[in-house]
């Protein structure tokens, strides 16, 4: 599976590689390894293409909407410029078409020789200045106890993700910490949460083909994979890119600052012992991270034997993932109580869910129609949404499709469905930046509602006597209190947290210790949503947009 729509340096002719790197360094005026919009407009202007053509070149090259071009994206842009100069229409399908991108000639850039010669002259002057020996200045040493603390300058915002990090630290995080959002909803975000690659989680009952699906996607086994008819995957396995093939225990993963799994420590050692990371070098894993989960059990007794909060872990991963695949087997369409709880825990992430009816070639066409109808009926009782969920039908493994059972029409259907699902997965890295913005805005709104609820409960507490009775009354009538908050601040009912979950967490706190409403904090988040984020998106949009 190819997930990248850009062209790597290794896919160019050797004589072109050095030239592209030289051009990239010229275009990258500040030397930060990124060609920003302003840099690109100056450099691309030498191609003499129209503004509309260059707008399309940028849109295709910056497929992930990062707001800048790295070396791979820059090479893609240069090849697209060359094709546009030859008269080709620039579309995203051009990279997937019949054109051999490796043999595309260098684009014609008028005036580039002058720019190269000027840069060489300036570099020579800098080297001469560096070779001049200057006498080092002696500065008076200040005792450490008299030195003033130095305020570090703010890091320049060079990507949309950098901007979101700054907005979170300056405006959203203070509100979350003040009103204990990390305890009631989601842990505090770290830098690694923003920088993480997009994730795809696979859910399903045992032996529905989750691990086999990942193997089929990668085209090979991955470390720690176990496949069989019995419940084989007994742990959460995160398959991600790494320099070599190895598995990393969950406790180690949870404490690594550069990994987005610090929040899993709240589920305790019992869960972390059932969590591991599988690393291997692979082009697919360079773009996305895959999360394999234990098979959902059918019996209540087996569920009670789990030593950790299974649905809580699923809910945590669901909030972090970009796509959730629910896998079903034609012979196991019944949705158990635990599976129902798991699907319910995905509340708020319905837009990420895709349903896969796997192993569909094990039944004939007539049975498949009945199975499909039964599956939709079962899902309709669990997924409380009026929209029809997307269902992919196929047999996602390395074996050839059983044409005897499904016939030639079924074979063609399965191939089209598989291509559609792979295309959906290919879009995940492209939409990752948009998804981060979407999740950030969703989180900000949830944090605001959490602050309104906490401050309202604080306001309902008596000043002196009867505090314990008042707290119990508020907890018993929590749904009614939510309604008061909704009416007072004109909030949508669908954005409020689960009453049962909130009541459960609230039982461990003293409401009287909560903070009163701080309008300045709320206003800061409103300004962030109304002004800062739109300005950030405007700054890193296509530089050729009017």
Curated annotation (Swiss-Prot):
Known function: Involved in endocytosis negative regulation, probably by influencing actin organization. Acts in early endocytic membrane fusion and membrane trafficking of recycling endosomes. Exhibits an inhibitory effect on endocytosis when over-expressed.
Spans annotated as G2 motif: 230-231
Q: What is this protein called?
A: EH domain-containing protein 2
Catalytic activity reported: GTP + H2O = GDP + phosphate + H(+)
The family this protein is said to belong to: Belongs to the TRAFAC class dynamin-like GTPase superfamily. Dynamin/Fzo/YdjA family. EHD subfamily.
On the tree of life, the source organism's domain of life is Eukaryota
Q: Where is this region: G3 motif?
A: 292-295
Q: InterPro entries annotated for this entry?
A: DUF5600, Dynamin_N, EF-hand-dom_pair, EF_hand_dom, EH_dom, EHD_N, G_DYNAMIN_dom, P-loop_NTPase
